[in-house]
Structures are given as structure tokens and as C-alpha cells.
Amino acid sequence: MPDAIWGIKRDVVAHFGLHDLPQEPLYRDLCGVITEGGAVHPHRDSNQGMLVHTRFNVMVSRPDGGGVPMIDGMLVDVPEGGIFRVDAGLLTHSCTPVIGARPRIILSFGFLSPLGRFSGLPFCISTP
């Protein structure tokens, strides 16, 4: 994995104070690339005991159209370079189909957080 990606994770951890949270053990950290016509189906991820599967996602490449995150029935407009949080173990989430040749690329960093840790924080929480 390129050092630049670990640098982005370090920045996300520092910015949102995630140092004390364990890493989500199943998906851990991942890079998602979705090309034209692809989408993420609506789903909810599993939690670990009393800890909530929480993901902080960086929108590395925003497609020409579509690829918009949907969290708990709400479309979340995330600019390229923006960060969006998903309480993946609590809320149904997906993304709309990608339109055009430009792919949707996200870096997704997974954590386990206590219930309510991020309540009141909007889904799209940082912009470039």
C-alpha cells in the first residue's frame, strides 16, 4: 500500500480523534472502485458486540454522474476530496449507479465505536 494512503488515514484519525478506536476487523480498510453502471446495493454491516461498525470514507474520485452515497434514505452530496462517515452497522447505506467513464473511488477506513460517539455529527463532515 502506498505511503500516501497511510498518510491520508493518519490525517483522518488525527482530525476526528479516532486514536482510541479499534479497527473494524472484517473489512478493515479498503479502496473501492466502481465503474460505469456499477453501484453499492442497500445494506447494513454487522457490529461487533456493543461497538458500532463505523466507516470514514474519502471520495478520491467523484464520477461524472451518480455514485452518490445514500445513508438512511438520504442522498449525501460529497465533493471530490470530501470525507463522509457511515454508521455502517446501524444505518442502511448504498450508492447510486455510476454514470460516465470517470469511476467512483473511495478510501474507506473502518473503526468500531461506542454507540452515540458521533451523534450530532453530519454524514458529510469535511470538504477539501
Regions found by a protein language model. Give the residues of each.
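Catalytic core of Fe(II)/2-oxoglutarate
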Residues: 62-128
